[in-house]
């Protein structure tokens, strides 16, 4: 089996080289590799022959990458940006998005077919797996997104996205064996919603099907912070539990388990959308179960490499998928290091005594110890990827996995059987679902409690926290490679001490200057953080929905700020306040300042209710206010019906003043200037994200800013900032700093 390992490894290396280095390499390189491969095979030495197998994998990988691009990607390049009529077949049920709905479909256009995602607002019928779809849409290719740095679609084998122009027409489709997994998934979703209580149905749906639409943003974020998000993203864990359950039902008969389990696992993987981690686990488990049947020994490196070969043969660009990278990195760490770590820990005198008896307590302890060893081992290769991709390292992960993973195994098996039972006997399934909901609630309680801890995760916002992450990685590596070199309690104490020191340095670095002002990168929105002395203020908190509130919370927590003195909302547009609820969940806010003249709307009502629930004092601003740290809040000068009416804020510092005008229009700026004697402000936050109707010449002349900050999303659909605004700022002689170009902007003084 090692030859398969060498060939698969060479194939994977070739795919990585092609995607990152040799994409435009000439064909002569393939010819040279072919010549080297042939020469090596002519030599009879075993070591050379093995090298030849690896080179053959390299040759096959490079040739397949080039052929795949020519066969499946280039035929669609000419369609990018065009609007055309199409026909398609739905591959799954539609999902809600921020701007409407989307559905995965097999799209046919000019005689060419490919997997695509259709975005639409309205349809003339119900969409089910197999439904025939037609309409007119603007097309965007995966290559165009790849050129802009977005590899998500390409890594999933989605070659086109189509934004419908007008209604999407639907017709009932014909049932087919190919769509049976998707149709069963839809029936299971309905069964889960019918059988399980509303507070646990979303979690069960995510655990069994990988469909996280029933989970709130808050729960998904808590799962990520607690380091157990993999539980609701169908992965190798789910496939392993499924096959383990089938093996148990087969009484340990490996032949029968292989005969029943492999088709069941394949069906489950397709039903859940064939995520890379599940496919990887399916291939690995198939090799493990089949190895004894063909009189071969299981070889972990071979199973890992073979699984990667299957995925890359299907789509070489899958290597760009973060889920695939994390799945293989975690699995490699567990395969190579978990066993040795478990043996080392189980040799501890106290643990060995507890593990020796064969009873329920020792079985539970073994499961928890296994979870701990797997969690630490998985970090060896996965932690750098997590840190680079997400900028977060969960410190709570080892503890949460120990406490919750064994319960999730029970919940997965019970939930799957209950959902299947609900298809036939809903009443009986309801009783099982009620009982199964209690361990689900316990898991969620553990996750939410862990996520609320002040240091549940490291947010890699500065060099101190990056240093802590590097130390933790080195410690995990040491425990995995040489488990007997250091005692576990010593490693835990060192981790706590170093993390605490780095957090202390991070807090001191933020607190040392007299004042600090930051414009956070929240996309197309605005969130500003101002600190003067010990007083911390957040002005607006909106952008990419709840993510803007989480961005603000992580910025504050990384600097040791767990309490905000005041949150000031200039107005109630979503891009200035839709992250408030998440911010209130993550940090304590003492006082909320809002404009009195804001017209009633649903978002305003929800935010005020959330603030009241969080114990935050609410103050409606009807007159100008001067706060103890010198910050001034200017009340609205217009009526409630005027668009973009709201508060203005002037943050006063020893070295500079900063003026923030929210979304004030040019007319509102004139009224502000006529009713207030504004000082010269070194920094001006451009109104309305740099829109043409804000940041007027009159305001620029009065304030005389040295720098203008613009909070704006990259490639936003509003074309902010406007060219006219940039010309006015340049004419005023001020420098421009934009979050879409520079990320988070910080001024220290």
What are these regions (language model features)?
Residues 564-575, 597, 684-688:
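Metallo-beta-lactamase
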Residues 574-611, 705:
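Active-site HxH/HxHxD metal-binding segment of metal-dependent hydrolases
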Residues 57-230, 550-557, 563, 597-599, ...:
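Membrane-interface helix/helix-cap signal primarily in integral membrane proteins
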Residues 591, 671-743:
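Cap/insert and terminal regions of metallo-dependent hydrolase folds
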Residues 212, 312-320, 448-566, 612-683, ...:
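Core dinuclear metal-dependent hydrolase active-site scaffold
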Residues 157-290, 518, 566, 591, ...:
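Aromatic-rich juxtamembrane segments at the membrane interface
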Residues 2, 22, 36-37, 53-55, ...:
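Hydrophobic alpha-helical transmembrane segments in multi-pass membrane proteins
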Residues 1-76, 184, 280, 479:
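N-terminal leader/targeting segments
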